[in-house]
UniProtKB/Swiss-Prot annotation:
Database matches in InterPro entries: INFV_PA (IPR037534), PA/PA-X (IPR001009), PA/PA-X_sf (IPR038372)
Transmembrane segments: none
Family named by the database record: Belongs to the influenza viruses PA family.
Name of the protein in question: Polymerase acidic protein
Entry GO terms, CC: host cell cytoplasm; host cell nucleus
Cofactor note: Binds 2 manganese ions per subunit.
GO MF term list: endonuclease activity; metal ion binding; RNA binding
EC number: 3.1.-.-
Subunit structure: Influenza RNA polymerase is composed of three subunits: PB1, PB2 and PA. Interacts (via C-terminus) with PB1 (via N-terminus).
HAMAP family associated with the record: INFV_PA
Amino acid sequence: MEDFVRQCFNPMIVELAEKAMKEYGEDPKIETNKFAAICTHLEVCFMYSDFHFIDERSESIIVESGDPNALLKHRFEIIEGRDRTMAWTVVNSICNTTGVEKPKFLPDLYDYKENRFIEIGVTRREVHTYYLEKANKIKSEETHIHIFSFTGEEMATKADYTLDEESRARIKTRLFTIRQEMASRGLWDSFRQSERGEETIEEKFEITGTMRRLADQSLPPNFSSLENFRAYVDGFEPNGCIEGKLSQMSKEVNARIEPFLKTTPRPLRLPDGPPCSQRSKFLLMDALKLSIEDPSHEGEGIPLYDAIKCMKTFFGWKEPNIVKPHEKGINPNYLLAWKQVLAELQDIENEEKIPKTKNMKKTSQLKWALGENMAPEKVDFEDCKDVSDLRQYDSDEPESRSLASWIQSEFNKACELTDSIWIELDEIGEDVAPIEHIASMRRNYFTAEVSHCRATEYIMKGVYINTALLNASCAAMDDFQLIPMISKCRTKEGRRKTNLYGFIIKGRSHLRNDTDVVNFVSMEFSLTDPRLEPHKWEKYCVLEIGDMLLRTAVGQVSRPMFLYVRTNGTSKIKMKWGMEMRRCLLQSLQQIESMIEAESSVKEKDMTKEFFENKSETWPIGESPKGVEEGSIGKVCRTLLAKSVFNSLYASPQLEGFSAESRKLLLIAQALRDNLEPGTFDLGGLYEAIEECLINDPWVLLNASWFNSFLAHALK
């Protein structure tokens, strides 16, 4: 069929048809019947217009080879065969100059004599059927329809055939010839059967009353009525060339598609400014634990009892002093708050029976740290809507921060192995169905790779802290409750261990809405000297509270112990997500699973065992300035887990925006790597959208710098 088309039709027509198909992502070599149909339709449109002119007196005349100098104007404007943007431009200018109503779909011709658009149809079926489908699709009184068939029949709106008998006969003869040529080559039957109807004829379904009003209210912008929107949706072709899509979406849009080459992308611009600071809800790599092994004390499992027991394992407490003040805070209050915690814990121990929870005295330092009475008084809107200068608070633009090296160190640390086991095998949930055998095997392998990982410790710590804080926020709304920060794990030998990281004191927590904030003060133990990277600890006041003896290869050394204190806040919805951090295990397991699936489909057998047990194989982990980093399958599991955990710990609007927008650029770059010749429009706008998310968030800035490494290496 393809050869027939190329022999049978004028090369210009063939070229236009190929272009039209390409615009809709169709291949003339594969969809040969469609190729033939498009060429036929184009040829009929050109024949319809050929030799028809309008003379100086605006009379319609037919000239086949007359005086080339006569002042003649073509009677028909050909719209079919132009690219969509150009075609709409022509339609728009005709409507503007003649005042004819603008059609909803691109017609084929415009008749300057009758002042109307014409839709030409060529059908291999019954002309009446095709005519009805066309009329139903374009739903316009203004556009004239003229249908031809390969059997010499025709049908036109109001039986007005526009052209003289002879011109129409020429078209019918040509169609008959094409049919015979196809039949003689054995192509006709397949061509005849391949014709698909226009959109099915739908009943007119009227919406009235309330539903109609709701429909009119909920239209997207720029649509005046439901009909107007419906026509747009009906006429929208769902696949094909992007220029065509854009010109369909809006007649005003004129996008130029630029090729995306290796030299096209530039690196993302990271912001300048002071280095970014730590903003997680609890310390990560800098946290220090006071631990008890094999806990068996009275009240074991009650957080306050566990905390007091852990505190007693340390003997190096000393008079606290401030070593790194908080720039904006009242630092003596932080110091007093810690002293108050120590004193009140001491009081508990002096009581006969230790209580299950501890509410702190509402001292001035805690009231200050927890922002008590700081919130502006809420006034009912009804009472103040007449105030003339009512306005929202002016809020400052966030200050730009530059990427600091500490966040990469944090990430590296999160990927490392610890010497404790943080999740039991059943943490991901038991099998339900018998088919789950392979899934269980994968889960067990994966769990073995990540159970010792520091990111898993962060998950369990996050789950514990958020659960405890949400519980306290609901159970003791008005109290300044003391909440120990605890985690539980097992040693390599399988012994149970309870760890204390520090304490939280929660403020008033009348949380009605998901986003209502509860303030808290966190006090966390650490051996990290804050003076080494003061920019990281901008939001903290750091005290030195003791000396710890550490065993090293050269014997025991004494190191100062610090307490990192800061005011922080969270909300019900954030705590809910924090409680569900175990989902990170599932997310990274699914990513690993898709890698195994890809491998298995190549080898045509389940590759789970080989995947995890072949220790010699390395896998790509990520990009760094040095190039693609590779590592063992365990390292891949832990890296994916750490990414998922950091997305949770450092969740923010900046991260949401960056992930969504940078993904577009990533897909374009991937397409270039796969030699798919991607094209783009408004690449500058995409860069702008990505870069407006690069403000001051450490995790987003790190991801942006990784993205730059990827761009540099991917497109070499």
